């Protein structure tokens, strides 16, 4: 990637001096005249007047780096955008140049690390949160319409952080550069997040950044365009990012020219041609959103799915950004309405608002995440938990870890408050340096219902996250942590599952399936002439595994196998039916045989009748259990309603108390002002009394003189 911001791969034509990091600058006033687009034009360009505005128009000369306009168009589907025709012509300067470059397709290949689009958006939120140390108080994620085509949507991520000066701006747009690698409490360390996230969300991005200027430097503002469409359709053989910079001199924004004015104009023309903005004034107007400092990222040509619809859904919820496709499960959305305490587990995969609310373990008090005009409320999974237990995990120190690295993780686990509904919710939210890396990590994949309802939260700063921040590097430390989490979840579930309606778990035993042979003399009766007795025949009896876990779980009611003791009389009849304890009989003719068979039929009928009675009893007990569960659910809902009403009442009381305090403060202030006024009036009254007394004395004196 060319840090100079050039759109053409050529060497500088001017020897750089020591000014501004060794780059030669030429300042020109953009406001010298009535037209903000009044630029000096180089020889290879001309101008035309349209709507009283002067536009830069290239002459009919095809540059070396651009092939004829029949080049293939970039696919609007992300997973197909990296495909290229090997037979397509290669620009002449690419094939004849021995230089090794970063090919534009690397931008797309690098972005494929983000399988999940919301994970890419989270990277941009991380960058804004890191700017809290530079004064950032908010990040606003919004969407608007592309002015160039008037119909497509564009994504905007804006914060009021410290912004970037031209040097830092180019570092941000360079691959693999990061100042955060060794900073405390910073997840970012690879210098790759901005490029991968923007290219995963859309084919193109344009960045506006304004910096106050420190250490005596003037404020600056920069514009840079990272456009895969531009690089692909112009057949560039290296990743080029056109940029233009401005500096505030005498309260006027003037351009900063590196190397040559022609190069600056090339960059501006490229940005205007391939961006959503139609003029230079449109570009400069974007800085009006930033006030004194900040960064505004505009992502356009957003990716589409296989059906031609945008991957990001801006229509379903006007205050949210959601995903279409496999990440969206309508069943989970409906369940989230029924089970509010499980809402984040059920919706974070497709809803940015839900995901952003749990993205950070703690959010700075003065920092806001605004999504399409509405604040995202911070949510802690601890608020969704009950019967919480706290564990401490301290792994064995490895030689490669720094001595100051914190090697203790505090784990909190418990049941989700909706666990008594027996819905399949479980997993651990694992954070790294305050950032959620593994949301609802399912470590125990037990058969049946074991582990359901158990969720937890911990911060593990000693494990290295992957560069896409959607998982951890597979290391021995991670494997040990996973094993320990499984152990904690099993122990917690086994000891407390009965508290949410599951059958108590006993100590597990290893029962192996076995096949044995037992003689059954009665079941193989041979009524054959010449045979005086029946010969025992081996019969296979299958003994299945016995597992102390529930089976056939459904969201509302748990069904379990129960054993009921049948009275000894029925057991004896049962044994009689299967020939256990019945001696072999001799052949006494068909009459005796029919009598025996009739007797067996009668005993079987009694046994069937008893079993039917037991079945009816079990069905009655099941209905009673369902009724009790429904009553408990109703009571739970009433409890939640009462809790909500109590919360609202407390909020109203707090509001009234605040208003009372405000009225009391106003009353005290008015009283103080009244006292001051009264003191002033008393003082004036005393002064007036003194004046009256003096006048009276003068009158008396005057009268005395007249009498004399």
Swiss-Prot record:
Q: Which Gene3D superfamilies match?
A: Histidine kinase-like ATPase, C-terminal domain
Main function: Exhibits ATPase activity. Binds DNA/RNA in a non-specific manner and exhibits endonuclease activity. Probably involved in DNA repair. Involved in RNA-directed DNA methylation (RdDM) as a component of the RdDM machinery and required for gene silencing. May also be involved in the regulation of chromatin architecture to maintain gene silencing.
Q: Which InterPro entries match?
A: HATPase_C_sf, MORC_ATPase, Morc_S5
Q: What ranges does the record list as Polar residues composition bias?
A: 1-11
- A biological-process GO annotation: DNA repair
**UniProtKB keywords:** ATP-binding, Chromatin regulator, Coiled coil, DNA damage, DNA repair, DNA-binding, Endonuclease, Hydrolase, Kinase, Nuclease, Nucleotide-binding, Nucleus, RNA-binding, RNA-mediated gene silencing, Transferase
What EC class is this?
hydrolase
Q: Does the keyword Amino-acid biosynthesis apply?
A: no
Describe its assembly: Homodimer and heterodimer. Component of an RNA-directed DNA methylation (RdDM) complex.
User: Which cofactors, by name?
Assistant: Mg(2+); Mn(2+)
Comp. bias intervals (Basic and acidic residues): 23-34
Q: Where in the cell is it found?
A: Nucleus
Write the Enzyme Commission number(s) for this entry.
Answer: 3.6.-.-
Q: Which family does it belong to?
A: Belongs to the MORC ATPase protein family.
Motif Nuclear localization signal is found at 672-679
Instruction: Please tell me one Gene Ontology term that the record gives under cellular component.
Output: nucleus
Please give the name of this protein: Protein MICRORCHIDIA 5
Would I find Glycosyltransferase among this entry's keywords?
no
Q: Which GO terms describe its molecular function?
A: ATP binding; ATP hydrolysis activity; DNA binding; endonuclease activity; kinase activity; RNA binding
Q: Which residues form a coiled coil?
A: 590-665
User: Where is the region Disordered?
Assistant: 1-47
